[in-house]
Amino acid sequence: DYLKMQKELYLFIIWQNGRFMEKQIIADLRKKFEIFRIFEVSWKEENFALNLARFYGKKLPKGCKKEKETGAGAFKVCLVYDNNPQYADGKNANIVKSKQDYRQLTGGGNLVHASDNLAETNENLLFLFGKTVKDLEQEGPRAEICVVRRDLVGCPVWDSLQQALDTVRKIPFTRVKAYKNSYLIHSRNADLARRLLNASSHFSIPGIHKYSIEVGKTRQPIYIRKIN
């Protein structure tokens, strides 16, 4: 029994067009997992496509007219504990199976999203709320549904440079230091740092890539370097 995993936090999203099966899905989640928190999130309609593309990154399902498919209205985010994760190929098979079941239940498309492993839960939470798994665990479970009306972090722009840096620092194995009147972000997860910052590329010096991010009404240069 020494191989028994510690319980881990996972995230399911029921997009607007899948919510006709919400009661059945949440009832099934309660049976299989331990419900930690449920959020109802709304994004501004004009930012929905941007938010979605950024949330999925390169993983936007192929040939999926994503926003038309998901619907651009309020969606449910269910955070659950799996008390006995079963890993295969870096993914928790319990979660993958449930996600596939719920996608079938909602008509076979991409109307339900789930994080495949703890790292993806963390990434999803950073984009949605600017918080890590640890941050949410420290806040503790809540019975009531939490209503959140806001876009992904840094959408359409960051409120301040400090907000952007504080958020990117939450990525594992990431450091921020002053560099050339700006900041250099060293990260093992450099691509995630770029996506989270919503940074657009300028040019690259070997090993260091210069980007810019939108802060208020200005563009701020920022450097990102991948470390191993």
For each predicted feature, which ranges?
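Non-catalytic terminal and connector segments of soluble metabolic enzymes
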Residues: 1-152
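Short acidic donor-binding/metal-coordinating loop in glycosyltransferase active sites
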Residues: 16-17, 181-183
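A generic structural signal for alpha->beta connector loops
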Residues: 32-35, 170-173, 202
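Short Gly/Ser/Thr- and Asp/Glu-enriched loop/turn motifs at secondary-structure junctions
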Residues: 73, 107-109, 177-181, 208-210
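Generic detector of bulky aromatic hydrophobic side chains
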Residues: 93-96, 134, 175, 185-189
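A residue-level structural signature of the nucleotidyltransferase/glycosyltransferase Rossmann-like core
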Residues: 113, 184-185
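Catalytic core of pol beta-like nucleotidyltransferases
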Residues: 139-165, 172, 178, 185-228
